[in-house]
């Protein structure tokens, strides 16, 4: 698996569309977006050779709006076709590249993985609550109680090493980016959870072991951002500061 362009600068309005070679596979990405990270993780997990184009989704390049009407990330381009939306891209990838499927083919098991993703969407909602705390620290106690409740729910849903069973699967790759955003928030002191051994062995032992396996996996390491840069971008977004889509690339 070769992902090229993961650390490329984000293209903004006025930037030219990079030519796409015949037969090439491309991912349009935003480095700090959890929905875009879903697609990136899935591509990496399937071992697809892909060119990554990072896009400034605030000051969008004109040509990108022809690929995604809202100018959001992610999108993929393959065989002259563009597929958008982080829930649809994984299934497309499994159908287009069936030799290394992640979503089960068994109808019942497939539904179970989709149900898990649906239940774990609450983690994204919990992460969003922490944006409000970044804007108003007096809300911390109120909001973090709800975050703890969601993490306990996720702890109870984790019946094996991974949500996908004995190895990372569909539900793991689609939910991980939102757990990661709560982890980023720990660096901003807006939630009382540990940075190391996140989210905490005492209260969430299964989830803590799961997160450790995921964050140190080759798949995640190939696409993720550091805690330092992720938390800085998250804080800038929450507090309506100017966003640096290339944060960390000059270090």
Locate the predicted segments by residue.
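GST-like domain detector, emphasizing the conserved glutathione-binding G-site
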Residues: 1-167, 240-251
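Tryptophan-centric aromatic hotspots in well-structured domains and transmembrane helices
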Residues: 35, 84, 88, 175-179, ...
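Alpha-helical scaffold segments in carbohydrate-active enzymes
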Residues: 38, 115, 119, 153, ...
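Membrane interface segments of multi-pass transport proteins and intramembrane proteases
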Residues: 103, 197-198
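Substrate-binding/catalytic groove segments of enzymes
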Residues: 161, 183-190, 220-224
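GST superfamily/GST-like fold recognition
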Residues: 166-191, 200-203
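A contiguous, mid-protein "functional segment" used to position or interact
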Residues: 202-231
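C-terminal/domain-terminus segments
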Residues: 227-244
């Amino acid at each position: 698996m070769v992902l090229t362009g993961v650390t490329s600068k984000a293209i903004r309005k006025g930037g030219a569309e990079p030519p796409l070679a015949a037969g090439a596979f491309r991912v349009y990405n935003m480095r700090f977006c959890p929905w875009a990270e879903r697609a990136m993780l899935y591509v990496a997990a399937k071992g697809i050779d892909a060119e990554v184009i990072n896009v400034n989704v605030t000051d969008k390049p004109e040509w990108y709006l022809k690929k995604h009407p809202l100018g959001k990330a992610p999108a993929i381009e393959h065989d002259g076709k563009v597929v958008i939306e982080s829930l649809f891209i994984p299934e497309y990838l499994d159908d287009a590249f069936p030799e290394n499927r992640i979503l089960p083919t068994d109808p019942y098991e497939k539904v179970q993985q989709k149900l898990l993703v649906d239940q774990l969407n609450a983690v994204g909602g919990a992460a969003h609550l922490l944006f409000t705390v970044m804007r108003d620290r007096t809300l911390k106690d109120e909001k973090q109680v709800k975050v703890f409740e969601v993490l306990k729910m996720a702890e109870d849903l984790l019946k094996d090493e991974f949500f996908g069973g004995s190895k990372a699967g569909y539900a793991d790759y689609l939910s991980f980016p939102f757990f990661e955003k709560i982890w980023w928030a720990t660096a901003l002191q807006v939630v009382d959870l540990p940075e190391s051994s996140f989210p905490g062995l005492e209260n969430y032992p299964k989830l803590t072991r799961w997160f450790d396996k995921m964050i140190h996996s080759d798949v995640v390491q190939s696409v993720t951002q550091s805690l330092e840069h992720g938390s800085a971008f998250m804080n800038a977004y929450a507090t309506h500061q100017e966003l640096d889509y290339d944060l960390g690339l000059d270090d």
